[in-house]
Amino acid sequence: MEKYSLVVIFLLFNIISFGQIPGPSCNWYFGTNAGITFNSGSPVALTNGVLSTTEGVATISDNSGNLLFYTDGLTVYHRFHGLMTNGFGLFGDMSSTQSSIIVQKPGDPNIYYIFTSDNDVGPNGICYSTVDMSVGLGQVTSKNVQLKTPSCEKLCAVRHCNNQDVWVISHDWGNNTFTAWLVNSSGVGTSTSWSNTGAIINGVSQSAYGQLKASPDGRKLAACHYGTTTGGMNIVQIYDFNPATGFVSNGVTLHNQLGLYGVEFSPDGKVLYAGTNQGLLLQWNLCAGTLAQVQASRVQISNAGPFIGSIQRGPDGKIYVARNNTSLSVINNPNVVGLGCNYSDLSIPLANRPGRMGLPNFASFYVQPQFILPEPTIVCNTVNFSFPTSQSTGCLTQNIQYTYLWNFGDGQTSTEQNPTHEYLLAGVYNVSVTINGPCTSTTINKVVNVPPGGITVSLYTN
C-alpha cells in the first residue's frame, strides 16, 4: 500500500493575507466630500460623499462591502447619500478627534449603535443613538442617550472574549479613568467597567484631543494625548486590555512629543505608529524587549511637514494617514520595523477633494486580517504547506500561549503546533486547525487533494 506524506508546518506571526477585502470597513467617507473604497482590492477615490468634517467620522458597510451609512457624529447619511430618517442632531462634533464609532448589535443584523463624543470636553460627553436598518434606508430610532460626561475625544471598540459582544471604550476627562461599556444582545451598558491607569488627563482642553486605538487582537490599547506649546499632555501611552472584563491596566508612556494626535497598531500588533501636528510620523517596535528598549526603538519614519492627522489601518493590510490634503499618505508594509515599512507621502489621490484631518473610526474587529492558506511546495512525495496566522502577543508584559487542534479529515487529529501527517489512501480531505488562546478561537479550513503517487497536489480554500 502506498503512503502519502503530508508535512504540515504552522508558521506563527509570519504571514497574513488580506485577500477577502469586502466587509464592514471597505468604504470610507471623510473630509470635505472625500472618500475611498477598497472593493476592488486597492483604494479608489469616491466622489459621491456629501459630508464635510474637519476631524471625526464613522462609516459602516455590510459583510459584502455594500455601504450602509456614515456620520460625522452630528448627521447620518444613508447609502444613497441623503439624510437618514431622523438622522440629525446627534451629540458628536465634526471637530472631535473620534466623533463617532458604529457597532452592530450582537445577534441582530438590523440594529446598529452610533456612539458619539463631544469636542473640547463639551457637556454632551459620550452618547449613543440607535439605527434600525430594517426600515427603508435606515432610521435613527433613538438619539443621544448619555453615557458619560465629561470625556476625552476618544472612542474605540473591541470584541468581547465570547466573540459576540463588544466593548466600547473611552477615556474620562480630569482623571486617569477608562470607561468600557458592554454592548450585547440586550443593548448598551448592561455591564460597565471602570479602570484607573496611566496618566491623569487634565489641564488645557487640548489634552482631550488625539486618537484611542485597539490592537487587532484587542489586548492592547494606545492613546495619543495632544498638547500645544502652551500646555497639554503631549504624550503617547500604551495599555493592556482584558476583553473578558473590559479592564484596562499597565498604562505606560512611550514618548513625550509636542502635538501627538494620530495613533495605530500594525496588522500583526507588534508595531505602533503615532503622528504629530508638526508632521512627524514615529514608529515603535513593541517587541523590542523591556519598556526602556521599546522606548529606545523609536524611529522617525517621516518629517514631511504638517499635519499628521488620523492614522487608520485599512482592510488591505496597509495603514493610511490623513494629511489635511487632497491626497492620503500610506504605510505600505506596516509590520516591518524601521524605514522598510515603506511610507509613501501623499500618494493616494482623493479626486481633488480635501481629506482634512480625520479618517473613519472602525471597531478593531472590522479591520481584521483574513487568514488564507498559501499554495504548497512539493519535494518528492512530501508536501509542505503552511497554515499561517498572526495573533498579536502584545509583546509588552504579555506572554500569550496558544493551543492547536488539527483534524486531518481521515479520522486522525493532532495537538502539535507543527504536525507531520501521513495519508494511507489517495483522496480529497478536509483539513482544519483550530487555534485557541485567551479570548480567541480561530479555525482555518483547507481542502487537500492527495493524488496517487504523490505526484501533484492541489489546494483550494474551503
Q: Across the structure, where does each feature detected by a protein language model lie?
A:
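Bacterial Sec-dependent N-terminal signal peptides
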Residues: M1-S25, G259-Y261, C380, Y429, ...
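Detector for intrinsically disordered, low-structure N-terminal pre-sequences
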Residues: L6-V7, I114, Q139, S432, ...
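Generic anion/oxyanion-binding catalytic loop in active/binding sites
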Residues: V8, N48, F408
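A generic alpha-helix preference that emphasizes hydrophobic side chains
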Residues: L11-I16, G56, G125, N175, ...
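Short, charged low-complexity linear motifs
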Residues: L12-I16, T116, L221, V294, ...
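Beta-propeller fold recognition
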Residues: Q20-T377
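Extracellular/lumenal mature domains of secreted and surface-exposed proteins
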Residues: Y366-N462
